[in-house]
Regions:
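Post-HEXXH active-site segment of zinc metalloproteases
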Residues: 34, 67-99, 103
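Short alpha-helical catalytic segment bearing the HExxH-like zincin motif
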Residues: 52-60
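Hydrophobic residues within well-ordered, non-membrane alpha-helices that form the packing/core
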Residues: 62, 66, 105-109
């Protein structure tokens, strides 16, 4: 089995897990990877390798798991407002939610017997660094 086929098999298994949870997964070229809680829909950029798509889907599934838990959903409710209005005091919640989504995605991989490679941690670090960079950027309309 080729490497790409191995990752495609794991990706397909995770798509099936998402479906079991009532989450629709779509693959589109050139889009931003995102989980939409209102639609219970995850969109993944299909331009990337199957391994990369798997890791991103694990992360987005982590966002679904946060949204599916009433306690976590309430905790992270201010995140969308913080993003939209650059509310500084809530921006740490954005980073906290991102870290938790990666963690829950990794736990889901273990739970559903989906092995991940060392590139997972590298992608996780890269994405979290990007979030930190965006969150520490100076915005003209900051509110405390």
């Amino acid at each position: 089995m080729t490497e790409e086929l191995k990752w495609a098999t794991k990706l397909n298994r995770l798509v099936n897990v998402c479906t079991m949870h009532g989450v629709k997964v779509r693959f589109k070229r050139g889009v931003q990877d995102v989980f939409s809680p209102d639609d219970k829909d995850i969109v993944i950029n299909s331009n990337r390798t199957k391994e990369f798509q798997l890791y991103v889907l694990l992360h987005e599934f982590g966002h679904y798991l946060i949204d599916a838990d009433p306690v976590l959903q309430k905790k992270f409710e201010p995140v969308s407002l913080a993003i939209k209005h650059h509310i500084v005091k809530d921006q740490v919640l954005i980073l906290e939610e991102e870290v938790l989504a990666w963690h829950l995605g990794e736990q889901a991989a273990d739970k559903y017997w989906i092995s991940i490679g060392p590139k997972f941690r590298g992608l996780k670090s890269k994405c979290l660094k990007a979030h930190i960079k965006v969150l520490t950027k100076v915005h003209p309309k900051k509110k405390e």
